């Protein structure tokens, strides 16, 4: 009976140590999280507009029609994979990604 009690106590203490260390790590990470109210809304608006433009570009490109929406530059009209948008947005695999 003693062995079972000792094992149970050791297991509980290990779980407590693991839980405490995980909670401390999570608390440390919370300091690095961005709070939505603290961001610059003007910058978010510009990024949203660029994302919309690039999504629009990818949709048109998917249909096979030529396109050059506002803010997007086309290096090579024949090569669809090299079409880039200003601000770090690129069309890749019919998706728009920010680099």
UniProtKB/Swiss-Prot annotation:
One of its GO terms (molecular function) is toxin activity. Its main location: secreted. Disulfide bonds join 54-67, 58-91, 72-74, 85-96. Expressed by the venom gland. It is found in: Secreted. Keywords: Disulfide bond, Secreted, Signal, Toxin. GO terms for cellular component: extracellular region. Belongs to the neurotoxin 12 (Hwtx-2) family. 04 (lasiotoxin) subfamily. This is U1-theraphotoxin-Lsp1c. It comes from Lasiodora sp. (strain IBSP 8539) (Brazilian salmon pink birdeater).
């Amino acid at each position: 009976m003693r062995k079972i009690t000792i094992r149970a106590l050791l297991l509980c203490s290990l779980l407590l140590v693991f839980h405490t260390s995980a909670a401390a790590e999570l608390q440390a990470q919370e300091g690095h999280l961005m709070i939505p109210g603290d961001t610059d809304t003007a910058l978010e608006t510009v990024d949203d507009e660029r994302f919309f433009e690039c999504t629009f570009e990818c949709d048109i490109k998917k249909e096979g029609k030529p396109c050059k929406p506002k803010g997007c530059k086309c290096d090579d009209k024949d090569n669809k994979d090299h079409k880039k948008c200003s601000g770090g947005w690129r069309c890749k695999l019919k998706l728009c990604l920010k680099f």
